[in-house]
Design a protein with these regions (language model features):
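Boundary-proximal intrinsically disordered activation/regulatory segments immediately upstream
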Residues: 1-70, 158-159
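Glycine- and other small-residue-rich loops at beta-strand/loop junctions that grip anionic moieties
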Residues: 11, 41, 129-130, 155-156, ...
Length: 272
């Protein structure tokens, strides 16, 4: 018989060893952890948790306050994991911040595919080089998922898409689109060209081809390269790709990388 609510465990001490996954979750502390090696990430809020579970990520446990207990208990009814419940003050003491989105859940990571596994079935991919802002990574994943991209590929130094802030900014869309991390960069560019992709490098350079003037064949496979805020794409990457730009006006030369990703993904979407 399926359960209708999760098994709840009331906690009263921030030192409870069962809560180790939730201690010191501020962004500064998270950056000090080898979180990918530990094999977990934190899903924050009912919506993000729901999307993570739907995508097949297994929950290890969850932490919530009594105010949010009813919906979270129903959501985790069949997860067979403890749902820890404490006061809002205790949750803040444990995590280091005010938990205002209802709940946190410690989730097990899934094995990442190799880029070469994603490319054959993809027609549109976003490639990020050295984008180390979790906020920008999360926003770009949301753009990519919502604007018809098939996958996101990351250079080795890009921020982790499953960090708490990335997941939150993406509204859980990091779970909706496949992604992979190149083992070597910029050598990974060869994987794109070998798979038949036309590689486009987004740049504010005035000599680049405007996106609205770009000629795209119906059967073109496109890889959109985006660089970090400020520094942009490296010279090696720009030299190996076709430079494209967003036409700008009003004396503004460029957009934030997440905003630029949204414009470019829309411009490069499949016809129809």
């Amino acid at each position: 018989m399926m359960r209708t609510v999760a098994t709840t465990v009331f906690v009263e001490s921030a030192a409870d060893p069962r809560l180790a996954d939730y201690r010191a979750l501020t962004d500064v502390e998270l950056r000090r952890r080898a979180e990918p090696a530990e094999g977990i990430f934190i899903a924050e809020g009912e919506l993000v948790l729901r999307r993570a579970l739907k995508a097949g990520y297994p929950a290890r446990s969850a932490l919530t306050s009594e105010r949010w207990l009813p919906p979270i208990a129903v959501l985790l009814a069949n997860a067979d994991v403890p749902l820890f419940v404490g006061s809002e003050e205790l949750l803040e003491q444990i995590t280091g911040f005010h938990v205002h989105r209802g709940a946190l859940a410690a989730m097990a990571r899934l094995p990442l595919p190799a880029a070469s596994e994603l490319l054959p079935s993809s027609g549109r991919v976003v490639v990020l080089e050295n984008v180390n802002s979790h906020t920008n990574v999360g926003a770009i994943f949301r753009c990519a998922a919502g604007l018809g991209m098939d996958a996101v590929l990351l250079s080795p130094s890009c921020a982790d898409p499953l960090y708490r802030r990335s997941v939150r900014v993406s509204m859980g869309e990091v779970f909706a689109i496949p992604y992979a991390r190149f083992g070597a960069w910029p050598a990974g560019l060869h994987e794109l060209t070998d798979a038949g992709f036309r590689v486009l490098a987004l740049t504010p350079d005035a000599t680049a081809t405007p996106l609205d003037a770009l000629k795209i064949a119906d059967d073109d496979k496109l890889a959109l390269l985006l660089g970090a805020e400020g520094s942009g794409l490296s010279g090696l990457v720009l030299a190996a790709a076709q430079p494209v730009r967003i036409p700008m006006s009003g004396g503004v030369d460029s957009l934030n990388v997440a905003a630029a990703a949204a414009v470019a993904c829309y411009a490069l979407r499949r016809p129809g």
